[in-house]
Amino acid sequence: MIWSDESTIILGRKSRRRLCIRKKGHAFKARHCDGTVKSGKISIMVWACFSGEKVGPLIVCDTGNVNADRYLEILEDGVVSFINKILQPCEGSDTVEVAADDAFLFMHDNAPCHTARKVTQFLKRKRIPVMKWPAQSPDLNPIENLWTMFKDAFHKRLIEEGIKPSSRAEVLKHCKTILKEVWRDQGMELITKLIKSMPRRCAAVIAAGGGYTKY
């Protein structure tokens, strides 16, 4: 199973709130405070994937939003190359050939760029089987939990290195390498734990009648 998703990283704020305790008189010292972005939020979209065997690539979307054409590039650069590292491609073929229909499944949600006709045709041509995915179900995708931890680690790395980009161009110039390094640091132990939570996730969604769950 290959899990994938896009996510937006917003600079100038953490991905989630945290409760912290400061010593008396230290609460408002500059080194204990997170700054805000004065010129408006800076956002970067990234795409990534993983399987139960490997952490896949992380791709930074320079153009901002992802449309069908950009997603085709992501599939070619990210998914096809990742699958070829996991499975042995058929000799003499530049497509992913699968010996059995159930050798693997590729998961992406129902975003318009994922379901566009040209994308569907590309996946069929490459013989990449796609998992049917229920609408509005981020709680069933374990990569969503990984995104939260990844964003926290990325923000921490920026603070540690004293990097404070003031524009999107600066983020793309200075942070691409850091983004990819932080993603690679997400260990297989954590990913395996998230994947093993799938039976509980499915049971929770069924028990909730398709409604909200803790995931």
Question: Which functions belong to the PLM regions below?
Answer:
Residues F106-N110, K124-N145, E161-I163:
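RNase H-like polynucleotidyl transferase catalytic core
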Residues D5, A48-F50, L75, D109, ...:
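Generic structural signal for small/hydrophobic residues in well-ordered secondary structure
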Residues M1, T8, I143-Y215:
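C-terminal anion-handling pockets and recognition modules
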Residues M1-V80, G209:
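Extended, low-complexity cationic-aromatic segments
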Residues S4-E6, P89-H114, L140-N141:
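Acidic/histidine-rich, metal-coordinating catalytic segments
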Residues N65-D102:
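A long, amphipathic alpha-helix that forms part
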Residues M45, F50, R70, I74, ...:
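Acidic, Ser/Thr-rich intrinsically disordered and amphipathic helical segments
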Residues A116-K126:
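Short, aromatic/basic amphipathic alpha-helical patches
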